[in-house]
């Protein structure tokens, strides 16, 4: 064993389904300026208003999908960590969560006390967004700076277009996609439109026309979450040999009144049912592990909404989770992660 650790980082989860734990988790999550990018006083006021009712609602949702072992996201991430231990030969494999426990700070501090000087930081997000990738990187840098840790990072870059990831995604979904169904919906997590426009390096591309994501230049694509999502969908459909009209893309998990990227998953579920789709497959390629957004938002509420609109069956395709091919692909991606300056 060497002194080069691999640190897998996912979003996080409440410690339990209690309202108090959910409130604490939501407060930490929503107060992140990369998540709600408003001035602190406005963000504090908005989050305080959200926390009046949302914790109880979310606690009920978490309880409906909670496993005996704990949070599905944490359990599945632990299983992936175990898979990666057999793949990563350069040192220990650790898991941290951006919000909740185990925290990035606690894990990095422990690694440093063990003499670990090199860490490959792996945000487990295929597509780039400030609210996912950037906040993980900046939190890790903050810990090293504040704790004065002697740690050098290599950082896994967004891997939405990497063949290893796409091949693993296709292989894990193939048993479901090869079954009989009417339509495949690829539902990605949504973002406020302003999160994209503020990162547009040209200042003249995002949302200027209906095909902006399809026609994105390499410069724009590097930081455009929506364009990267459409890229994943197109590459997946091409690898699976899916014809036009058999699949579509939508964006879920809206929060607040700001304009979010479209089309919205809720509207798409209703429209597909009204168009005569009876059996619908849904994949959520923005997530590498099943979580409340997949299991509850799509698997439970999405199914109910689809049926109310006239659909009959909604099949949720599992995320990559601890799939062995995914673990092998992730190891390859992490091995070539560049060293941060």
UniProtKB/Swiss-Prot annotation:
UniProt keyword list: Cytoplasm, Heme biosynthesis, Iron, Lyase, Metal-binding, Porphyrin biosynthesis
Pathway(s) the chain acts in: Porphyrin-containing compound metabolism; protoheme biosynthesis; protoheme from protoporphyrin-IX: step 1/1
Top-rank EC class of the record's enzyme: lyase
CDD domains: Ferrochelatase_C, Ferrochelatase_N
GO BP terms in the entry: heme biosynthetic process
EC number, UniProt record: 4.98.1.1
Entry's Gene Ontology molecular function annotations: ferrochelatase activity; metal ion binding
Catalytic reaction(s) noted: heme b + 2 H(+) = protoporphyrin IX + Fe(2+)
Pfam families referenced in this protein's UniProt entry, alphabetically: Ferrochelatase (PF00762)
Residues that, per the record, bind Fe cation: 189, 293
InterPro entries membership: Ferrochelatase, Ferrochelatase_C, Ferrochelatase_N
GO CC field: cytoplasm
Cellular compartments annotated: Cytoplasm
Domain of life: Bacteria
HAMAP family: Ferrochelatase
Protein task: Catalyzes the ferrous insertion into protoporphyrin IX.
NCBIfam families on file: hemH (TIGR00109)
Family classification: Belongs to the ferrochelatase family.
Protein name per UniProt: Ferrochelatase
């Amino acid at each position: 064993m060497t002194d080069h650790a691999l640190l897998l980082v996912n979003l996080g989860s409440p410690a339990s389904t209690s309202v108090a734990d959910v409130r604490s988790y939501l407060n930490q999550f929503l107060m992140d300026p990369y998540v709600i990018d408003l001035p602190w006083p406005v963000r504090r006021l908005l989050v305080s208003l959200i926390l009046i009712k949302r914790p109880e609602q979310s606690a009920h949702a978490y309880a409906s999908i909670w496993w005996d072992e704990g949070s599905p996201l944490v359990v599945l991430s632990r299983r992936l960590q175990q898979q990666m231990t057999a793949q990563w030969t350069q040192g220990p494999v650790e898991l941290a969560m951006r919000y909740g426990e185990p925290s990035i700070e606690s894990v990095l501090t422990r690694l440093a006390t063990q003499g670990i000087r090199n860490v490959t930081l792996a945000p487990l997000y295929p597509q780039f967004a400030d609210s996912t990738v950037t906040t993980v990187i900046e939190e890790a840098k903050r810990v090293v700076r504040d704790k004065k840790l002697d740690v050098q990072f290599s950082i896994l870059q967004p891997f939405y277009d990497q063949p290893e990831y796409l091949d693993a995604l296709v292989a894990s979904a193939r048993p479901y996609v090869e079954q009989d169904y009417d339509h495949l919906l690829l539902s990605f997590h949504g973002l406020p439109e302003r999160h994209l426009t503020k990162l547009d390096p040209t200042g003249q591309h995002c949302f200027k026309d209906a095909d902006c994501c399809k026609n994105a230049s390499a410069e724009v694509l590097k930081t455009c979450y929506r364009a990267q999502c459409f890229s994943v969908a197109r590459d997946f459909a091409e690898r699976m040999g899916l014809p036009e009209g058999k699949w579509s893309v939508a964006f879920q998990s809206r929060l607040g009144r700001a304009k979010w990227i479209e089309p919205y998953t809720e509207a798409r579920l209703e429209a597909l049912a009204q168009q005569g789709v009876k059996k619908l497959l849904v994949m959520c390629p923005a997530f590498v592990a099943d979580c409340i957004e997949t299991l509850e938002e799509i698997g439970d509420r999405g199914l109910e909404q689809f049926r109310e609109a006239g659909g009959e069956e909604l099949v949720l395709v599992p995320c990559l989770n601890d799939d062995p091919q995914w673990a092998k692909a992730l190891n390859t991606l992490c091995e070539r992660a560049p060293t941060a300056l």
